[in-house]
Swiss-Prot record, chain B:
This is Trafficking protein particle complex subunit 10. InterPro entries: Ig_TRAPPC10, TRAPP_II_complex_TRAPPC10_C, TRAPPC10/Trs130, TRAPPC10/Trs130_N. Belongs to the TMEM1 family. Co-expressed with Shal in the nervous system.
Amino acid sequence: MAFCIAVIGKDNAPLYLTTSDMEQELELQYHVNAALDVVEEKCLIGKGAPESKELYLGLLYSTENHKIYGFVTNTRVKFIVVIDSSNVALRENEVRAIFRNLHLLYTDAICNPFYIPGESLTSKKFDRAVQKLMSGTA
Amino acid sequence: MQIKPIITYSGSCPLFRSLESQILNAIPLDTCEWRRTFQRPTKHVRLEAQAQQFNVAALEKYKQGDWSILEHPILHIFVTECNDVDTYKATIREAIDIWLKTLTSYGVSDWMILLVETLDMRKTKNFMPRTTVLDKIRLDFGTKNDDRCISVLNPAKFEQKSTESFRCLVQRIRFLMLTSYNRNIVKYEELIRSKREKRNIEGWDFRQYFFMQEDLALIFEKLELPTEALIQYDELDAMFSQFITHTGLNEKQQWLNHFRKPLDAFHGICLTRADKFEMRNKIRDEGVSLLEFRNYLFERQAYLLLTCNDIPEIAKRLLNFLFSTLREVELIKLECQEGALCCWEFVCALEVLQLCEQAMEPNELTCFQHCAPIWNLAKDKLYELGKLCGLLPGCTPTSEQLHIVVQLSSGIGDAPSEQHQFLQATPQLRDRSPNRKPKKSGAEQLKEALGSNQAFQKLYLELAELAISTYKHVTRLRSARLVGLDLGNFYCALNEPHKAVGFFTDLLRELKAENWHMLSSQTLLELANCYRKMGDSLAYTKTCSSISCCAELETLVRTFYFDEFLKSLKTLKTTLSAQPSIENANYCVLEDHFRILDIEVVNQKPIIQDDYILVQLKVESLYPRGVVAENVKLCYELEASSLELAMENVSLTASPSTVKAKDTSSRLKVSLQLVYKQDNRLHSAAVACDLPKSKQPVRRTSSTKRKLSPSVQADFTNFVQAENIALQPGVNLIEMKAKATRVGCWQFKQLCISMSSLEFLSEQLPFMPATFEISTKPASATLEFKTLIAGIVQPISLNVSGGSFIFPPDAKITLRCSKNLRIRQARNTDDEAAYNDDQSFESTLQVPLVQFKSFEERRIPLEVLTDMPGRKVSKHHEHHIALNCPWSRTELPIAVDFQPAMEATCRLHTCGTQKFLQVIMKGMEAHLLLQHAQVKCDVPGVQLLDLNPESQQPIEIYKSLTVTYLYEIQVEPLKTEHELPVVKVHFVIKYASLSQPDVWRTYGCAFDLVDYTTLFKLQAQLEPNELCRLRTVCNMNLKITKVHENPYTDLMYEVLNDQNLWAVCGRSAGVVSMKDVDSHSISLDVMPLSTGFLPMPSIRLSKYTAGGKSKTDGHSKVHPFPPGQVYNSTKSMQIHVIASVAGDQ
C-alpha cells in the first residue's frame, strides 16, 4: 500500500526509514527529505494561530508517481508516508488510519525503558509491524 | 460565442422591433440586485439580453426535458399599442389570452405584458376615461401578477417625457429576468441531476451531459458567479476522472472511444486564447483527444480562477492536473510518441508560470510557493527531452533523434493567436514594462531549445536557477538543494565541475547537519567525482577519505575510494608545497573518520616535572582497512581556574557571579588584559586571545568548500604524541607519552592525527576528560629516628630524596652537630672493636653522595651519641643537627631530642645525731647494667661509710625499676656546721647498655648536703601508756630538747592529726621559747577515734618569728625545719587503742 514509511525526529534526523522497493530507496529518501520543508511550513503556519489540535498534515506534495503525506506528533516527531499515485482507491481516511496505527506503534516502541530518545528505532517488533502496515495487512 | 439571455416578443412585433435596440442597449447599463434562493447571498449583477420572436419550438424542447439553459427563453413579452378599451375588448384581449394559455401549457410563468401609450390620443379627447386599457389588462390577466403588466410611453415619439417611464420598464425587465433565472436554474439543476443518475444506463453519453452542465457553468459565469461556475467544471472533472479510472469495470461506456484518439497533437494549455470556445466547438463537432479535452477543462477552470483573482489556485491545481492526466492516458492506453507527454507537461508548466509572474500582492508569496515545484517540473521535463533528443552535454543528436525533434515540434503545434486585449481587460495583473519585449510562449521556447544543444543548455540552466531561487524565496531550502544536486550533475556533464562543487557542498552540509547519512554518502560520491575532474587533489583526498569511512556505502565502493585516498595521499605533499596558501587548508574533521572512545592518563603516581606523561587513547577507526598515522597528538592546556582567580581579584563592573559563571571548558585560550592609567587606576579590562600571531586560531567559515573543515585549532604547544601508529578498523589502543615540562593543572583539548601532510582535527572532545597535574618534586633530606636516649649509642637514618635536582659527581651532605652531640656513620657490627670505640664519633660528618642520580632515593644509616646530663635539668635534652645540602644554600636545622637513660636522686636520713645518705637510681627508657657505685667526698673531716653489700654481678635495671644505695656520713666532732655549712658529695656509677655489655661508661652526679646537723629532738608520750580507750581523752606529753646550739629561740609546734584517727581536744599548736632552757615540755589532750594500733600523731616543728617588732612586718612567719635538723624519736611508735566499755564510763 505504501512505498515508504519514515519516522523523523524533532531535529529532522531520520530515526526510522523503510522502503518497499530497494531500488527506489535513494529517490524515496530524497522525497522524504524534501517533505520536511512542507512539514515545517505547515507547523510554522500553526505557530501564529492558536495551537492546532490536528496532527494529520494531509498531502504534503505530489510527484508524478508518488504522493507524500505527513503527520506530526505533539513532541514534534514527524511521520512521512509515501504512497503510489496510481493507487486511486486509497482514500484519505485510509491514510489517516495508517498514521494512527503508526503512532500507536511508535508510542509502544519508545515505551521501552532502554530506548534513548533521539536514537534510531531498532526495535524488531516495530519493524515487523511497520512492514505489515506498509503492505496493507495491518 | 456570445452568451446572452433570450427574450421573446409577441403581439405587435413591428412596434417591439422599433423599441428593441433601445431596450437591449439599456439593460447592461446598470446592475440589478439579485435575491437568490436557498439563503444564498444577494448579488448585484449586470445583465445582457437578446430578443427573438416568440416560437413554440423552444417551448416544445422545454416540455420534453431536452432543453438547454443557454437556448431557453427566460422572458416572454407581449407588446401592444392599443389605447382604446373597445378595441382591446374586441381583439387584443383574445390574443393575449391565447398567448398566455400557450405559455401556461408549457409550464412557463415568466411573461410580461407591455402597453405602449401615446399621449396625443389623450390630448385629442378632452374627457378622462373611467378606466384605461392598462387597468383592463391588469384586471383580466394580472390578478396575482400586477408587476408583470406595465405601460410605457413611446420613446420614439416623446424622447424627453418618456425617460422616467422607460427607465422603469428596463428595471422591471431586469428584475423579471433574474426572477426567471432563479426558477430556471433550479429546474435545470434538477434536470442535470436526473441525467447524472442515469450515467450507468447503456446509451448514456458523457459528452451530452458535459454540454448540459457546461451550459449551466456558462450561465453562472455570465451572471458574474465564477465560483459557482468553477464548481460545475470541477464536478465534470471529477466525473470524467472517475469514469476513466473505473473503465475496466464495465464496457457500457461507448462514448469513451471518442477520447481514444492517438495523441498526434500534444500542445499544452493556452490561457490567452482569442476564441475561448474554439475547443468547445471542436469537442461538439469533430471529437478531440483526451489531452485536448483535459486542456480545455483546465483552461476554463483557470479562466474562472483568474476572474476571481485567485492566481495561486491556478498554480496549485496545475501539478494535480498534469499528474492525473498522465494517469488517465496510461489507463486508457493511448498511443503517443515518446517524449510527447514531456512536451505537453513542459508547455503547460511554462504557461502557468508566465501567468504567475504577473501576480501582484498579496498573492505573490502564495503564488511562489506553488510556482517553485512547477519550475522544478519544467526543468525535469526539459532534461528528459534533452536525454531523448541527444541534447545533453557531451552528446550529439543522431539522425533518428533529429527526426524525433521534428516530430515533437510538429506535435507541439503553433501557438494560437493571442488576445492582446486580455491583459488590458484584467487590471489585477501587473503591467509589463514597455522596455521588456513580450515573452515567448512555452511552445516557442521548447521548440527553440530542442533545436540546438546551446539553446537547450541555456534554457535548462535558466529553469534550474529559477527553481532554486524560488524555492529559497519561499524558504524550502531542502527542495532548493535537491535542485542544486541536479544542477550540479548537469555542470559535471558540462565539464564545469568547479560550478557543481558549490551545490554539492551546500547539500552535503545540510544533510550532515541533520544526520541523513545515506544521502550524505551519495553526495560525497558526487563531490569526489567533481574534485577528481577539477584536479583539486587536496579536496579529492579529503573526500575519498570521508567516503571510505561511510558505513552506509557498499564495501567495494569504500575499498575503491580508500585505495584512491592512499594513492593521492602520497602525491599530496608535492601538491601542497606547490600551493602554500593558507586558504588551501589541509585539515579534516576527525569525527568523520575516527571516533574518540576514551582518554585516560595511566600514570600511577603524581606526575613530576621532567617526568613522562603516559596517556592511553582509545580510538575507533572507521576506515575499511588499516592505515598508518605518522603522528597522533593530543594537546592539553591549563585549566581556566587561574584566570578566574585573577578576574575575581579585579574590581570589575560585572558581578562576581557573572565572572564565576564563565565556562571552564572554553575552546579558546584567552587571557585577561588590564589597562591602567598613569596614576595606576584601572582604565579598562578586556579579554584577548592568547595565542601566537603566527598561528591562526579561528578561520572564516567559508560558504563553499571549507565549511566542512574544523573551525578552531587549539594551541598545540603542549601535547602528548605517538608516532607511526598503525590504525586498524575498529577499536585501537594508542599509548602516547610526552615529557612534563610545565607545572600546573592541565586539561586535554584537541586530538590531531596526521597522515602524510593531511591533519585530522577533532572538534570538542566528546566527553570531559580528567585533568591531571604536573608538580615539581624538590630534593629533600630528612633524619629519621625513634625515641633517642642520651648516654648510649642511638641509630638514626639519613634519607635523601633526589627529586628533580641534578646532582654533581662530588655531591655530599654535611651534618654538623651541636655541643656534646657526636655522630658517625653506622659501623658493621662484625667489627666489634671499631663498634665499641667511642673515639670514632665526631661533631661534624660529611656524607658523600656517590653517583647520586635524579629522582633517586637513598637511605644512609648513622649513629649518634651524647652524654647524659649530670643534673635533672629538663625532661628532654635538646640537640640539633644542621644539614648542608648541595641543592640549598642555607643550612637546614633539624631538632633532635634525647631522653636521659636514668636519673639519680638522694635523700638525707637522721637517727639521733647519726646521718645517713640514700641514693636512688631510677631506670628510664634504656635497658642498662650498673656496677661500681661510689660516693666520694673531697672535704677533709668528712668520712663516708659504704653500707651496701659487696656484689660481684652487675645490677640490671630497666624502665620503672629503682636501685637504692645507702651510705653513712660521719663528720668529725670538731667540725661544726658553722665551719662546714655545705658538704659536697659526688656519686659515681658505671653503666653499660645491653647491646654493648663490654663498653662501660661513667655516670656522675653531684649532691649538696646542707642543714645536716641535728638541732632539736622531739619525744612524745601518751598516758595511759598501754591502754587507751576509744573516745577517751588521753594526755600526750611532748618534750622538745635542744641537742645542738643554734640561734633559733622561738619554736612553734603543730599537731598534724588525721581526722579519722585522732582528735585534738584543746590547743593543737603553740609557741615555746627555748632561749634559756635546753628542753621544754608541753601537755596536750588527744582522743583516739578508731580502735587498733594507731600511729602516734604527727608533730611538726617550725621556726617562729614574731611579727610585732616593726611596723613594716606586721605578720608572723613560720618556716618548717629541714628534715636534717629535727629528730622525732617516737615517729613510728604505735598506740594500741581498745574499745571503750559502757560500764566504765
